[in-house]
């Protein structure tokens, strides 16, 4: 049974081990892969934050995404803006970030971009709920961590300070980078 409340206006969010179980995440991946392929794209960037449930969700999501021959460009553990950056300068303008954002540690979710536009959980809700299970063993993953250095260079090139200052960083439970 799918908790329909996980489908939100700007993302998908819920209790990682209950609402976002492997079966549901896989279905979401299948639906997103179809949506991406309809735009003429055949790749998607994928990043995760540092939550304990991220790798399990990633594995199930990749299974669903690859079920329709979509190539997953794996960014690894990165801050959310890096996924958006990748969709602007990389090999595709589609990306998914597995992140619980500011929510409690038991939660997790997905932020999705297709053709430079945010994907609402509402947009895919009915397709996910009505999807019949489809099995496949095809996995097509490429390492895309080379974009991390480009992202860092872009950030540093836009930060010109007139003098040396002390900086404190609070990543807010996110993946703040190296």
Give the residues covered by each predicted segment.
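Short C-terminal domain-edge/linker segments immediately following a structured domain
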Residues: 38, 75-78, 126-131
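Ferredoxin-reductase
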Residues: 33, 40-115
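Surface-exposed loop/turn and secondary-structure junction residues enriched for glycine/proline
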Residues: 9-19, 23, 78-81, 86, ...
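Catalytic-loop motifs flanking and including active-site residues across diverse enzymes
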Residues: 28, 79, 176
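Gly/Ser/Thr-enriched, mixed-charge loops and adjacent short helices
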Residues: 108-178
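Generic secondary-structure boundary signal with a strong preference for alpha-helix termini
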Residues: 23-26, 59, 88, 111, ...
């Amino acid at each position: 049974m799918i908790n329909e409340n996980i489908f939100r206006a700007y993302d998908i969010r819920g209790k990682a081990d209950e609402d976002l179980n492997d079966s549901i995440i896989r279905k979401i991946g299948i639906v997103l892969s179809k949506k991406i392929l309809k735009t003429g794209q055949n790749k998607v960037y994928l990043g995760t934050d540092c939550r304990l449930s991220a790798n399990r969700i990633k594995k199930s999501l990749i299974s669903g995404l690859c079920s329709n021959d979509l190539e997953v460009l794996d960014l690894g553990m990165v801050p959310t803006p890096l996924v958006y950056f990748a969709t602007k300068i990389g090999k595709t303008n589609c990306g998914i970030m597995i992140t619980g954002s500011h929510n409690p540690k038991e939660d997790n979710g997905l932020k999705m971009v297709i053709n430079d536009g945010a994907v609402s959980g509402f947009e895919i809700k009915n397709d996910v709920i009505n999807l019949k299970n489809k099995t496949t063993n095809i996995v097509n993953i490429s390492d895309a961590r080379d974009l991390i250095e480009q992202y860092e260079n872009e950030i540093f090139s836009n930060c010109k300070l007139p003098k040396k200052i002390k900086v404190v960083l609070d990543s807010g439970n996110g993946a703040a980078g190296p």
